[in-house]
A protein has these predicted regions:
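Short intrinsically disordered coil segments
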Residues: 98, 241-242
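Intrinsically disordered, low-structural-confidence terminal and linker regions
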Residues: 23-26, 31
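Sparse recognition of residues in long alpha-helices and their boundaries
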Residues: 97, 221-222
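Beta-strand-enriched, solvent-exposed domains that form extended recognition/catalytic surfaces
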Residues: 31-157
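Short amphipathic alpha-helical segments with coiled-coil-like heptad repeat character
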Residues: 2, 89-92, 212-216
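Bacterial Sec-dependent N-terminal signal peptides
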Residues: 1-24
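Fold-level signature of zinc-dependent metallopeptidase catalytic domains
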Residues: 156-216, 220, 226-236, 242-243, ...
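Sterically constrained small-residue positions within well-ordered secondary structures
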Residues: 10-12, 30, 72, 112-114, ...
Length: 281
């Protein structure tokens, strides 16, 4: 049987979940444009020391994240990003995250061998200069590493992406696309001539999702697209079988030497394939 891999990028329910928190007072249009600032970082180190490095900044057409409660954290994570308006010192955006790097820190390998991991975070594109603070937390919720850097939105070295790299197929349009949950299926391990198979597999996965509550009754809140990113080889790599394949995202089993743990470490590639499609994380 041929192997098929479908990577899901499911956007958090930030736009429709009722958060029991104080209403935020940051107006999106006062501080941001309708674009995305992609923050590419390298997280590196071992159990004794973790470091954060800026890799690249990218401006992508369109912003598909939340536009309300911008300065409030929607959920806890193992790290967080805070944007502060440089002129006023006001916090204008916060978001939390959890990364594969931080998961790896719990492994035996992290005790003896320093490694680095790509990480990509999306924030709304600022109108004016901002300070960006990145914090990593340890297992006791203490800050283990932090980096603060300044971003001028007019910086000529911010790379711009204005159009999708791949064809985007809409499987289902939400009743209200300004207030919805966005799902993007990314083709990984499908050749160019297999895109019909990819779309069919995505449809099967979609129907399986909506067979269950609360998804069935909330179906109209979901906006679902497919990103047709072709691979040279079919399937995914399985290192413990010495089976390596050339795929768009370089995904493989055996992450952290666990046979069934399937991931991609190439997050910049993933976000390049997704660029300008309607997704948030």
């Amino acid at each position: 049987m041929k192997t098929r891999l479908l990577l899901f990028l499911i956007v958090i329910f930030t736009n429709i979940i009722k958060v029991n928190a104080q209403q935020g007072d940051v107006c999106f249009n006062d501080y941001f444009t309708d674009n995305t600032l992609r923050l590419d970082y390298i997280f590196a180190g071992d159990t004794s020391r973790q470091l954060i490095f800026v890799d690249e900044l990218v401006k992508v057409k369109g912003w598909y994240g939340r536009r309300k409660r911008l300065e409030l954290l929607p959920y806890e994570g193992n790290g967080q990003i805070t944007l502060t308006d440089k002129a006023s010192g006001k916090t204008i955006y916060r978001h939390s995250f959890s990364t594969l790097f931080q998961e790896w820190l719990s492994s035996d390998e992290a005790k003896t061998t320093p490694k680095s991991f790509e990480n990509v975070f999306l924030v709304p594109f600022p109108k004016s200069t901002v300070d960006v603070k990145v914090e990593l937390f340890d297992f006791h919720r203490k800050v283990s590493s932090t980096l603060t850097h300044t971003i001028d939105p007019n910086d000529i070295l911010i790379r711009e992406i204005q159009r999708p790299k791949n064809p985007i197929v809409t499987l289902q349009q939400a009743d209200d696309t300004t207030n919805c949950i966005r799902i993007a299926y990314v083709a990984e391990g499908y050749k160019k001539e297999q895109m019909d198979d990819f779309i069919n597999d995505a449809k099967i996965a979609t129907e399986a999702l909506f067979e269950h509550e609360p998804f069935t009754s909330m179906r109209g809140y979901f906006n679902i697209v497919c990103v047709e990113s072709p691979s040279e080889n079919e399937g995914t790599s399985t290192p413990h079988k010495k089976d390596w394949r050339n795929t768009t995202l370089g995904s493989h089993f055996d992450t952290f030497y666990s046979n069934r743990y399937l991931t991609t470490l190439h997050l910049k590639k993933l976000h390049d394939e997704l660029a300008c499609s309607p997704y948030e994380h």
